Amino acid sequence: MSIPTNTPKFTRNELNVFRLPSDVSKVTGALRGVGRNIALVPTMGALHAGHKELIRRAKRLPNTIVAVSIFVNPLQFGEGEDFEAYPRTLDHDLATLQELGVELAFTPETVDLYGESGVAVTLDPGPLGAELEGEMRPGHFGGMLTVVAKLLNIVRPHYAFFGEKDYQQLVLVKRMVEDLNMDTRIIGVPTVRCDDGLALSSRNAYLSEEDRERAAVLSTALGMGANAGAHGADAVLEAARAELAAHPEIKIEYLELRGTDLGPAPVDGEARLLIAARLGSTRLIDNTPVLLGASALGSDGDDGGDAGHETHDDATGDGPHAAPAGATPSQQGYQRES
């Protein structure tokens, strides 16, 4: 492979770390010029098994260089949120990327992306950006889409991988790419969970020991809801609420059933059940796929034979994952922590 001489040094089969956007653009442009595909995994660092799964999925693509960005984006944190406290573990994260065989890490500082005077132009996420997470965190999705758009413009990847745990984020990023005619395929990857079903999140580190034990109730409630899909939307919500009602110490911010595009849920077909809750001072979100109405009936007509069937976009050819009857999210074909 011949890289132009004015391009920053890039060594194959090693982790190459770049801070400046201009350096990353030159390197990825040169790689594309010699026929390589680029896959981007955007992160805020504090890498865990969920991030590792995104990277593994990206690495399965043939003829592809995997780039991982690590940037705690101030634009997506509101007043009183945990921007200052958000875990920053860059040295550990870079060691993790090296172990996984990642070849390009982009680790900008805030000034590198937004300049000395800050960013003047941001993206409007539209009406969906004010619902669900957007209602609880005003401005969050505008800040998120702005940094993702910048990363896509800097790296210009053929693919970008996002976890389904942040499902509303995934939907909005896909919509942005479509609306703005960006030439990147957005790939959603199923949530990685602990053995008790809790979705992996960097914010899990904030949980007290007692709250950590309670937190698994969120995934249990989602699973109970998904299993009621054959009986319709009301039954899904009632089943989930019944499970949560036994745990009044968990403060529910929202529990909603939506379509896969986060519009209204269909009477029959694929939907998404989403939850946000506080345990102590820690805020957690989660979601699960749901099949509603006749779509939830197995080929033999039994209730819930496919409850929680995965419908994620998979560039690696693995296809969807189907859940067994009675499955909780930890059993629904999701990736397990490794």
Residue ranges and their predicted role:
Residues 261:
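Basic, glycine-rich polyanion-binding accessory segments appended to enzymes
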Residues 274-279, 288-291:
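Short beta-strand elements
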Residues 2-249, 257-258, 281, 288, ...:
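Nucleotidyltransferase catalytic core that binds NTPs
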Residues 38, 272-274:
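Ordered hydrophobic segments in well-structured contexts
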